[in-house]
């Protein structure tokens, strides 16, 4: 369902940061200021948000992978829930340097986590001493927290979706180095440079974060559903050409 400007207003998307913290590169997206707080121009935000969703929808239809990134307290739960709903990988704890640029190292950690999960499933921890089981449990919990959201990501993602580019500067830099497109929410205190699909908006309010993230997840789900429908329709069309009615009375 399309998001309206009223919904953006109700979610507080238009509230930027204090004017003294502004980044001049965001000037084209600022409507003005009130009580020393910059007000973001939603007439600019809405079409740019829709462009970002269109890209996410097309990428998903082509079986692309979008990595969701949001590690701030107010976005962690939303990022995990919406990414899982869309069947996409996510990072909602600390971003580990090299997650993209040194993916080989990440793969080693992912293998370790999967091996530990298999060991737990097989009941191997029951044969461990209390101390060994405790150490195993601690290591596994640490791995789940840091890389659990990307354990099924088979390779480098086709794009990343980021909430707060300043807080996730390393993730954006790594994506830029590898030429991975970046969809991101950019508030008035950060630069839109290096972002392929800019969504000018509040990156702190939980309602605003939920709105952006649910929108991207919806676009992905819709894109995949459209792709499946096209395949089904194409298959039906092919079968229709070959269909021959048989008269049983003949």
UniProtKB/Swiss-Prot annotation:
Gene Ontology cellular component annotations, sorted alphabetically: cytosolic small ribosomal subunit
Secretion signal, residue range per the UniProt entry: none
Keywords of the record: Ribonucleoprotein, Ribosomal protein
GO biological process: translation
Record bears the keyword Ribonucleoprotein: yes
One Pfam family hit: Ribosomal_S2
Keyword Coiled coil in annotation: no
SUPFAM superfamilies, A to Z: Ribosomal protein S2
GO molecular function: structural constituent of ribosome
Lineage: superkingdom: Bacteria
Name listed for the protein in its UniProt record: Small ribosomal subunit protein uS2
InterPro entries found in the cross-reference section: Ribosomal_uS2 (IPR001865), Ribosomal_uS2_bac/mit/plastid (IPR005706), Ribosomal_uS2_CS (IPR018130), Ribosomal_uS2_flav_dom_sf (IPR023591)
Organism of derivation: Paraburkholderia phytofirmans (strain DSM 17436 / LMG 22146 / PsJN)
Family statement drawn from the similarity comment of this UniProt entry: Belongs to the universal ribosomal protein uS2 family.
């Amino acid at each position: 369902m399309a998001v309206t400007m009223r919904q953006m207003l109700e979610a507080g998307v238009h509230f930027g940061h204090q004017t003294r913290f502004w980044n001049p590169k965001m000037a084209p997206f600022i409507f003005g200021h009130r009580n020393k707080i910059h007000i973001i121009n939603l007439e600019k935000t809405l079409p740019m948000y829709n462009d970002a969703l269109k890209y996410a929808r097309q990428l998903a239809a082509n079986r692309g992978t979008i990595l969701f990134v949001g590690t701030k307290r107010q976005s962690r739960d939303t990022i995990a829930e919406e990414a899982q709903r869309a069947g996409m990988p996510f990072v909602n704890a600390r971003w580990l340097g090299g997650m993209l640029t040194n993916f080989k190292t990440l793969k080693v950690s992912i293998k370790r986590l999967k091996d530990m999960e298999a060991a737990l499933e097989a009941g191997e921890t029951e044969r461990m001493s209390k101390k060994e089981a405790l150490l195993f449990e601690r290591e596994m919990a640490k791995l789940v927290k840091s890389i659990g959201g990307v354990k099924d990501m088979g390779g480098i993602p086709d794009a990343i979706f980021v909430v707060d580019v300043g807080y996730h500067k390393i993730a954006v830099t790594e994506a830029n180095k590898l030429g991975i497109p970046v969809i991101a929410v950019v508030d008035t205190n950060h630069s839109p440079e290096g972002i392929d699909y800019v969504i000018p908006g509040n990156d702190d309010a939980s309602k605003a974060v939920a709105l952006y993230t649910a929108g991207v997840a919806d676009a992905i789900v819709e894109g995949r559903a459209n792709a499946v429908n096209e395949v089904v329709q194409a298959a039906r069309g092919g079968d229709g050409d070959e269909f021959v009615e048989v008269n049983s009375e003949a």
